[in-house]
């Protein structure tokens, strides 16, 4: 009874003040010692089988609680939002993984739980599931391996052509370049659309908003711009090439499939990446897709190359973000959007930039698309994006149904920095066109009230009608800049003033065919020089005059 003797010796060794200890406490120490002795004696007498069963009992009774710093448990799940207890070390916008294999992103870091948005079907997650940190902020694969592919918002291939071969990854939420690495916009980004390249020119590194009601041709302008880059990407000059990223947000899958087919038919997919977060995808994926596409574009920008990104459209991204924010219990503001919805778009669009030569001289041009309701450009999201961008192309339903396509309202459309990037040849021929069209619109409003107009006003109306006809252009038929210059030259210099407006389109097609087949050297000179010299001017005048004489006859 060694254990009992030790306990008694300890009790006797206590000083007299230990008398204050109750008899119960002293008794309990003797009971504990006796139980320990009995347990040891029983273990000695038992066989191997009983020892293993006792050990099994102790193992099963062990504390199975997990480390709450790196993992957590789902408290509630619904509407694509999971509330998770634990994950104390998780970072904002860190990727987390659920036990079902689904990924999510931590957005709300609260004292007692973490709000996680789920990238996928939340029905695969149930309460009590374990969630673990990945330690990585959300990133996507980037590089030239993605060209010609269709990927989702996380960079996973969804075109059935196998996995993406890229080994380079980049965070989706990178900070925009500062002031020092940037340089002012100076190189043209040609869309191939006469009305845009002549009146609202876009430069490489610019952010130009395409805004209008549904079904007014917003996506058509974006697709024409991508198709027009084929003439540069087929060449060998890397400085002229423009890689394209098209981000489809909240669109129908059939629409995206149709778009990919159109680009494939035009042989434009070889220099294009399509990032798709369709209407059936979870709201967090629709929110994330523009940032993922932007990171893919930044890869080209930061490697001294040029890229164009189209966000179609940011209205749907804002709606997805509003849905997430309200479900995360963030306070709503105007139109129920959260207070940081301006920052949502500004931090995205500020990443489009023209870098200076010390930083590679690359560029990322952004063409965000915004859908308005009944032409209301004073709504919350349209005004936000208009204030962030460097100009806007405003499309009108009324013009669209009048047959003026692209339905660009020349008065409301503006490019704040693009004129510095416009080629000199286009500046020379289109310089007065915007003013003439503005005067035409002003006079046309009064002309319907009376017919007794002076000769100068009648001349203004006549010229305006013909220029409006001249700016019409078919879908998926972008034009080279030198072809645009030749056509606009004929209209602005007054050679078409006596031609019937209904014959303008026919004249344009015939004139272009004639110039391309008979005067290729002149077009090459305009393209190479980038300006119209006196010699070129005289040659153009001669060609237009001679062709018109034959055309009218």
Curated annotation (Swiss-Prot):
Residues listed as glycosylation sites in the UniProt record: 76
InterPro entries reported in the protein's UniProt record: ATP_synth_asu-like_sf, ATP_synth_asu_C, ATP_synth_asu_C_sf, ATP_synth_F1_a_nt-bd_dom, ATP_synth_F1_asu, ATPase_a/bsu_AS, ATPase_F1/V1/A1_a/bsu_N, ATPase_F1/V1/A1_a/bsu_N_sf
Residue list for modification Omega-N-methylarginine: 204
Entry-annotated residues carrying N6-succinyllysine: 161, 167, 230, 239, 261, 305, 427, 498, 506, 531, 539
Recorded topology in the membrane: Peripheral membrane protein
Posttranslational modification: Acetylated on lysine residues. BLOC1S1 is required for acetylation.
Record localization: Mitochondrion; Mitochondrion inner membrane; Cell membrane
Location, primary (coarse class): mitochondrion
GO annotations of cellular component type: mitochondrial inner membrane; plasma membrane; proton-transporting ATP synthase complex
Site positions for Required for activity: 413
GO molecular function annotation: ADP binding; ATP binding; proton-transporting ATP synthase activity, rotational mechanism
Keyword Cell membrane in annotation: yes
Function as written in the Swiss-Prot or TrEMBL entry: Subunit alpha, of the mitochondrial membrane ATP synthase complex (F(1)F(0) ATP synthase or Complex V) that produces ATP from ADP in the presence of a proton gradient across the membrane which is generated by electron transport complexes of the respiratory chain. ATP synthase complex consist of a soluble F(1) head domain - the catalytic core - and a membrane F(1) domain - the membrane proton channel. These two domains are linked by a central stalk rotating inside the F(1) region and a stationary peripheral stalk.
HAMAP family found in the cross-reference section: ATP_synth_alpha_bact (MF_01346)
More info: The siderophore enterobactin (Ent) produced by enteric bacteria binds Fe(3+) and helps bacteria scavenge iron ions from the environment. As a consequence, the mammalian siderocalin LCN2 plays an important role in defense against bacterial infections by sequestering iron bound to microbial siderophores. LCN2 can also bind iron bound to endogenous or nutrient-derived iron chelators and plays an important role in cellular iron homeostasis.
Subunit description: Homotrimer. Component of the ATP synthase complex composed at least of ATP5F1A/subunit alpha, ATP5F1B/subunit beta, ATP5MC1/subunit c (homooctomer), MT-ATP6/subunit a, MT-ATP8/subunit 8, ATP5ME/subunit e, ATP5MF/subunit f, ATP5MG/subunit g, ATP5MK/subunit k, ATP5MJ/subunit j, ATP5F1C/subunit gamma, ATP5F1D/subunit delta, ATP5F1E/subunit epsilon, ATP5PF/subunit F6, ATP5PB/subunit b, ATP5PD/subunit d, ATP5PO/subunit OSCP.
Protein name, UniProt field: ATP synthase F(1) complex subunit alpha, mitochondrial
Species assigned in the record: Sus scrofa
Gene name tied to this protein: ATP5F1A
